[in-house]
Amino acid sequence: MFHALASLDVVLVPLQLVLAMAGMGATMTLADFKSIVRDPSGLALGLVVQVVCVPLLAVGLAQALGLGKGWAVGLLLVAAVPGGAFSNLLTFFGRGNVPLSIAITTVSTLGCIATVPLVLRVAARSHLPPGFVLPTQRIVVEIFAYLLIPLAAGMVLRRFAPGRSAAVSRWSIRGALSLIALITLGALGSGKIRVVEFGWQPPLVIVVFGASLALGVPQLMRALGRYDDDTVATTIEVAVRNVGVALLLVHFFFPGQPEQAHVLYTALFYAGASPAFALPIMFRHGWGRSAVLFRRRRPRPG
């Protein structure tokens, strides 16, 4: 059964991404971005953190810890993908700047058609086999087909059938999460991922990566003078990543080699662990405390 389930990855992986992106699009309207247009600095900073700082952290960890090729590429792949719709929901619960969260998610998702191949080409080159050519065109086509088209379809639904969009979004995201659970079950049960054999280092590295984002980004945002609601939005956005995109691209790396399982394991483990990286700041700010550890509150005036 597990082997049959694992063999369905070629269908389940793109399907879960289509559902997730359609569900995210069904929550969005152009009005969500009006406040961001008036003050684009928060969006610009969030994108720099997402596209530049997060991959740099992954590169630093991979080099400092001497990660093997598959583990390094897996970590860099997770670092290259944008934030996901779940980050917007957690930002809402944490009383963060929801329009900013949605804006970073949307712009980074639209931009990932260029940024994901670029980050992988620049950062992962030294970890890939000699002669490996990154299939940039195929990556762009798959991102366009499985991310941008469903996202646009969801936004069109919200525009012309707002009464149905909430239910579509809710069930689409639930369906996407259920499919990720099935993908994980198939990978574990079929032996594609051997947790005991892989040992303790891979999950520890992933936890260090996620915890570094959760602890470091708030300090960076405070140092740059951002209010707490912006800090919550940006931190959750970079901590909770759209791992569905990473799962979509796993098959490009180390086909038929053991290292591909390392890439898959990294993506699936981060998908399961990432909410834990976002919960502390969500609860702290949601309960009226400072979004930044060991610092005073900095609420937005008015």
State where each predicted segment sits:
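Alpha-helical transmembrane segments of multi-pass small-molecule/ion transporters
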Residues: 1-302
